[in-house]
């Protein structure tokens, strides 16, 4: 028995190597079960899917496999594979990451967060709302992981003032954890990017969370404090995941949708920064509202009894202390600097230009140029380029005439060294791997083959299809990276839409947004893992809270797709650009020639 246990431990320690060696052998029958080229492409895709789900290789390294396997297996020449890693979609995402680096470099996000918390008040339910609103807003522009890691130390400082040091002694992961490498100094420093966290998770060394602390069960006040603490911690990663869906640059799956749309449907131009924001921002607000109500009621921050009950002096004093802490931290930032003002103006310009380039409901500024020449990537790169030469100190004309003034070079708002350190370049490779995979599916004919296998689903009502897709993907992404999940599912959803003869976006958007709705497990997303690693949450806390969050997300997404999304993306018709793809890729039955479809 001891020998068997020892052998099991050795197998577990070598599990990644075993997956690397055995999975390619296990998938070999696929090469003989399908037509040659389609079979080879499916072999590569399934191999990458298993490697992504098991993290046998780092995610970004797995994303590079098409560069090796597609040419060797005769699927795509290298000249067609490599450009997929630097499409204009990748540069749009890169520009967003660089802008986020500048915001974090000058602590602009921290100033915004503290100011919002000062405005919402210090009652627990209001603070939870403030945390969720602030985190979601930051997550629209920063990475979800960075937003979470920045807000958790702020929440910790507030909770220390509310409940004292005894309950706050394990408020953050242990010093030295890579997932919180930049939570330094006064406990309120932010993690600049998700790069360190992803690196640690890809390496396979995820620290076990400490056991939650023991608190006396005989005290209702202690139970109230424990629940408030959990409510704070759990609301931050959830709102980060929700907020990331509101903009195209907010999370990688949104940009993967844009890139794969251009691959499968080159004539599709309905999705851009502006149209996506008009669709996703109201959905984000609705989800934040119902999520806040659910978390507040579940963890005691808000209840009918608390509204009627007079506040105790202890709680009133604690709230006053929390308010003082927030104000003190805000004052410690000092007066707003010239660099902060400059970054804020450039950030606003960045967002406004992206939104107004081609908002669809009115002509955008891109109409002043030749059609198709100016994309969102052009806008993003143009703005972030300014960061590398615009001075961080206020320029002065007197300097030119004062010959005694020091002749030191003015530092720019962002240095390239800082950008190199903080931008998660691995995500760029991951995006490229998804686009290369989509290109391989199209060129090899695998997309057409998948479409043929989906023939039995042609009679599924589209509304039911949306619900099923969102549920399946939301469940799948609880156990796998949301980026890997959407890379795998989007080609299938595109072909399913052709078979159902519905607008492709009617299925592809729910799949994309749904893969961000991962709330039930610590391993589902890096933000969940960071919150769980504080040691104050149990898995059952996340399952209990996240189950209803997932359900609410699915229902709200279905509501959005069948109401305002119909108008924004013209989902009630089967577009010509999809019809062209259908004619080239799959032979639709004669009965499916009507150009209008009812989606609900």
From Swiss-Prot:
Catalytic activity field: succinate(out) + 3 Na(+)(out) = succinate(in) + 3 Na(+)(in); 2-oxoglutarate(out) + 3 Na(+)(out) = 2-oxoglutarate(in) + 3 Na(+)(in); N-acetyl-L-aspartate(out) + 3 Na(+)(out) = N-acetyl-L-aspartate(in) + 3 Na(+)(in); fumarate(out) + 3 Na(+)(out) = fumarate(in) + 3 Na(+)(in)
Family: Belongs to the SLC13A/DASS transporter (TC 2.A.47) family. NADC subfamily.
Organism: Mus musculus (Mouse)
Gene Ontology biological process terms, A to Z: carboxylic acid transport; dicarboxylic acid transport; succinate transmembrane transport
One of the record's GO molecular function terms: modified amino acid transmembrane transporter activity
Main location: membrane
Gene Ontology cellular-component annotations: basolateral plasma membrane; membrane; plasma membrane
Organ and tissue specificity: Highly expressed in kidney, and at much lower levels in brain.
Job of this protein: High-affinity sodium-dicarboxylate cotransporter that accepts a range of substrates with 4-6 carbon atoms, such as the citric acid cycle intermediates succinate and alpha-ketoglutarate (2-oxoglutarate), as well as other compounds including N-acetyl-L-aspartate. Transports the dicarboxylate into the cell with a probable stoichiometry of 3 Na(+) for 1 divalent dicarboxylate, rendering the process electrogenic. Can transport citrate in a Na(+)-dependent manner, recognizing the divalent form of citrate rather than the trivalent form which is normally found in blood.
CDD domains: SLC13_permease
Residue spans crossing the bilayer: 17-37, 56-76, 83-103, 138-158, 230-250, 279-299, 337-357, 373-393, 462-482, 506-526, 547-567
Protein known as: Na(+)/dicarboxylate cotransporter 3
Pfam family membership, one: Na_sulph_symp
The keyword Phosphoprotein is annotated on this UniProt entry: no
InterPro entries, alphabetized: SLC13A/DASS (IPR001898)
Membrane topology: Multi-pass membrane protein
PANTHER family: NA(+)_DICARBOXYLATE COTRANSPORTER 3, SOLUTE CARRIER FAMILY 13 MEMBER
Intramembrane segments: 423-443
Keyword set, alphabetical order: Cell membrane, Glycoprotein, Ion transport, Membrane, Sodium, Sodium transport, Symport, Transmembrane, Transmembrane helix, Transport
Membrane topology, Extracellular segments: 38-55, 104-137, 251-278, 358-372, 483-505, 568-600
UniProt subcellular location: Cell membrane
Residue positions with a glycan: 584, 594
Residue ranges, Cytoplasmic side: 1-16, 77-82, 159-229, 300-336, 394-422, 444-461, 527-546
